[in-house]
């Protein structure tokens, strides 16, 4: 079963608008539509403690954890802030996401 369509895509630059990492920006690494979640580079870092296995020693690994998609907004480089998006249809029928404030296209 497919998940929902989310307002962000992989490699988008987003701003966190809620939670402990509020106001941080980062690139979307992975989309998880079934959980309504995303992984953002450098945001919501958690520590994973691993036990020693064979020749490997135990360690503490830091990695990104999933955050809910409603806690992020797309970053517009032209407006220099987090913005809402609108979908516009081009003359050739292709749909693109654009900034509501300035009209900058995010899908090229």
Curated annotation (Swiss-Prot):
Q: Does the keyword Ribonucleoprotein apply?
A: yes
- Read off the CDD domains from this record: KOW_RPL26
Matching entries from InterPro entries are given as: KOW, Rib_uL2_dom2, Ribosomal_uL24, Ribosomal_uL24_KOW, Translation_prot_SH3-like_sf
Q: Which GO terms describe its biological process?
A: translation
A Pfam cross-reference name = ribosomal_L24
Gene3D superfamilies, per this entry? 2.30.30.30
Q: How does it assemble?
A: Part of the 50S ribosomal subunit.
Its job = One of two assembly initiator proteins, it binds directly to the 5'-end of the 23S rRNA, where it nucleates assembly of the 50S subunit. One of the proteins that surrounds the polypeptide exit tunnel on the outside of the subunit.
What's the protein name? Large ribosomal subunit protein uL24
What is the originating organism of this protein?
Geotalea daltonii (strain DSM 22248 / JCM 15807 / FRC-32) (Geobacter daltonii)
Organism phylogeny: Bacteria, Pseudomonadati, Thermodesulfobacteriota, Desulfuromonadia, Geobacterales
């Amino acid at each position: 079963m497919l998940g929902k369509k989310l307002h962000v895509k992989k490699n988008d630059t987003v701003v966190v608008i809620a939670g402990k990492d509020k106001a941080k920006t980062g690139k979307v690494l992975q989309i998880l539509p079934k959980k309504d979640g995303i992984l953002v580079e450098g945001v919501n870092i958690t520590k994973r403690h691993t036990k020693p296995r064979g020749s490997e020693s135990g360690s503490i690994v830091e990695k990104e954890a999933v955050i809910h998609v409603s806690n992020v907004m797309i970053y517009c480089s032209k407006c220099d802030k987090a913005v809402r998006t609108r979908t516009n249809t081009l003359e050739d029928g292709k749909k693109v996401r654009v900034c509501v404030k300035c009209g900058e296209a995010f899908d090229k």
